[in-house]
A protein has these predicted regions:
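N-terminal "assembly arms/tails" that initiate or stabilize quaternary assembly
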Residues: 1-73, 216-217, 312-316, 320-349
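Sequence/fold signature of self-assembling virion shell proteins
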Residues: 3-4, 8, 146-149, 184-349
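Ser/Thr- (and often Asn-) enriched beta-sheet segments in non-cytosolic proteins
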Residues: 39-41, 72-74, 79-81, 136-138, ...
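Short acidic, glycine/tyrosine-flanked loop/strand segments centered on an H-E-D-like triad
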Residues: 65-95
Length: 349
């Protein structure tokens, strides 16, 4: 039995790449895709924090030139592949198509999982180092540490925290099951309840993945990312780009199930002794055809360039929620507005 999971971080990067406000323009995407063998560099302008506002008019306007850099794209290569022996499916209860589909599914799932982990690693590496206003949360190790008593507040508080860092636009939340559990409990307290806790997560888009893991003592982890600040570049090998056909080898550019990214494919056949493929069922295949299916892609997960992340906040904030004791329910805060009406509950009459 196979159960493909959700790969929310990967899907998020792909979605943001294709968005109208993407940091990756079509020209860069096209140039990068065909760049195998070359170094891809993106011209960027550094942050200048020394701008002076004067209070006296003058006939002389001073120079203040920007400084630029060439940001080098760092690639990671991902490869998968499998083989098929067509004759092995003659007089076989499992058809060629069924086995091919299952092999394609398991390898594609493994690739999606690896890419999702790569996307999360990019978020982890580029999370904010500074918070201009952390409210009343602990911020250590570049992570917001949320006490279990404040679990119901962090999804609402992440908006003003991001806004204080000058990121006021829509937020995406890349998170795990612990955060989904929290959202579902908040959803139970709507507009007709004592307190409308749905406002805590309203206006955000959630991207769920099992690859956002909790550290020891944590019950939920998420990355908050402002819309329009990330993207992903891909490139394929030169023969795939050329769609080469030679010596019974075929290269192409394809899209795999579950992964909306172009990858390079390589197909060829050979003839040889395939009798050991699946034991006794193929012992007669001493001279048979074998098919080879290979797929590869170079991937670079990008976050908006920041020349001084120790002073200027990145558009990503990581937060962790402390774990409750086992079988301890999530407690919703109760706000008593007329405490004075109860003995010992407020100011004396």
């Amino acid at each position: 039995m196979t159960r493909p999971c959700e790969y929310g971080a990967l899907d998020f990067f792909i979605e943001q790449t294709n968005a109208a406000n993407s940091i990756i323009n079509p020209k860069l995407r096209e140039r990068a895709f065909a760049s195998m063998g070359n170094t891809v560099q993106i011209p960027v302008i550094n942050y200048d924090g020394d701008v002076t506002v004067g209070n006296v008019r003058s006939c002389v306007i001073e120079d203040d030139e920007n400084t630029s850099e060439l940001y080098t794209v760092v690639w990671a290569t991902y490869t998968i592949g499998f083989t098929m022996v067509p004759a092995a499916y003659t007089n076989n209860e499992i058809s060629y198509e069924h086995d091919f589909y299952r092999k394609m599914e398991k390898y594609t799932r493994a690739l999606a999982d690896a890419l999702d982990k790569g996307a999360i690693a990019a978020l982890e590496a580029q999370k904010a180092h500074v918070l201009k206003d952390r409210l009343n949360y602990d911020f250590s190790g570049n992570v917001i540490k949320v006490k279990k008593e404040m679990a119901t507040e962090i999804l609402g508080d992440i908006d003003p925290i991001m806004r204080a860092n000058c990121y006021p636009r829509m937020l995406h939340i890349v998170c795990n099951a612990g955060i989904e559990s929290l959202v579902r409990k908040l959803a139970q307290h709507g507009a007709t309840n004592d307190v409308n806790k749905q406002l805590e997560y309203a206006g955000k888009k959630f991207h769920y993945t099992n690859n956002v893991t909790n550290e020891s003592g944590q019950n939920g982890t998420f990355f908050a990312v402002e819309d329009g600040n990330i993207g992903v570049l891909t490139r394929v090998d030169r023969e795939a780009l050329r769609r080469t056909r030679a010596n019974f080898h075929e290269w192409d550019v394809v899209r795999l199930p579950m992964i909306d990214l172009p990858v390079g494919s390589h197909y060829y056949t050979s003839v040889g002794d395939q009798s050991a493929t699946v034991g006794a069922a193929t012992e007669d295949l001493t001279c048979a055809v074998k098919e080879y299916f290979g797929f590869s892609v170079d991937v670079a997960f990008l976050v908006a360039y920041n020349s001084d992340p120790t002073k200027v906040a990145n558009p990503i904030i990581k937060a962790q929620i402390a774990a409750r004791d086992q079988n301890e329910p999530l407690g919703m805060p109760v706000y008593v507005t007329n405490a004075a009406a109860f003995p010992g509950g407020g100011a004396s009459a």
